[in-house]
Amino acid sequence: MIISTHKISEGITLTTRSPSGGKKRPAIILCHGFCGIREILLPQFAEVFTQAGFVTITFDYRGFGDSDGERGRLIPEMQIDDIVTVINWAKEQPFIDKERVGLWGTSLGGGHVFGAAVKGGGVKCIVSQLAFADGEKNITHHMSSEEKKEFISTLEKLDAVKKASGREKFVSITRVLNDNESKKFFEENRTQYPDMDIKIPFLTVKEMLDYKPVQYAAQVTCPSLIVVAEKDTVNPKEQGIELYNSVMH
């Protein structure tokens, strides 16, 4: 296995894993989840895929890990554009078959792959794992109508302050993704991986609320596999099923 790291356009840092031998190979681009960096979780998947004969590409979104950009700034459309940038780079590499580039995404990245396939074009296939379809439904499904109204009103007021003054509140990742599973994951990894120990805008919650990958899923034409987990408490299986139904429509 040949492993190499590159800094490409837009300041995106990526790592390729390639099987030995000189022939062109199909490629899988692995797209991480919420505030994820390429050193965590993805290498295990990438190594298995590479052992099966694929070139694999892991990367850091702008603002995270080793990539350039404002630290902690998470905007879904910008991350989708990052994936498209990686797709275009992959298709230019002499060791990659440009007609066989696929996307594999987990959690938030599992939603991004639909947008990247639509915006980038030429994607051979998609695997979306443990993603959500509709951010507003996913975040507010447990709230009463009054609680939801108050929650959204608070975010809108904070957004108005930001636009008027340029000031915004930055918080730890676990203040935004605050379920027990996520807290445990970030607490376990931030010591070993200092790039995980960052602050993000509190209004990232609003970015997630407004994000609806299902709208892109309805436009996807390439073969797609949607993977859900029965006991997923972050992105319940109903969210993945909604993505599936949208793709099949």
Language model regions located:
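Conserved alpha/beta-hydrolase
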Residues: 48-68
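N-terminal cap/lid segment of alpha/beta-hydrolase-fold proteins
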Residues: 1-26, 76
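Primarily recognizes the serine-hydrolase "nucleophile elbow" in alpha/beta-hydrolase
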Residues: 85-163, 197-200, 208, 219
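Alpha/beta-hydrolase
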Residues: 153-215, 222
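Catalytic nucleophile-loop/oxyanion-hole region of alpha/beta-hydrolase
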Residues: 7, 38-41, 64-102
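The serine-hydrolase catalytic nucleophile loop
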Residues: 34-47, 61, 238
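Short beta-strand/loop motif that positions the catalytic acidic residue
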Residues: 220, 226-228, 232
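Conserved alpha/beta-hydrolase "acid-adjacent" motif
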Residues: 233-239
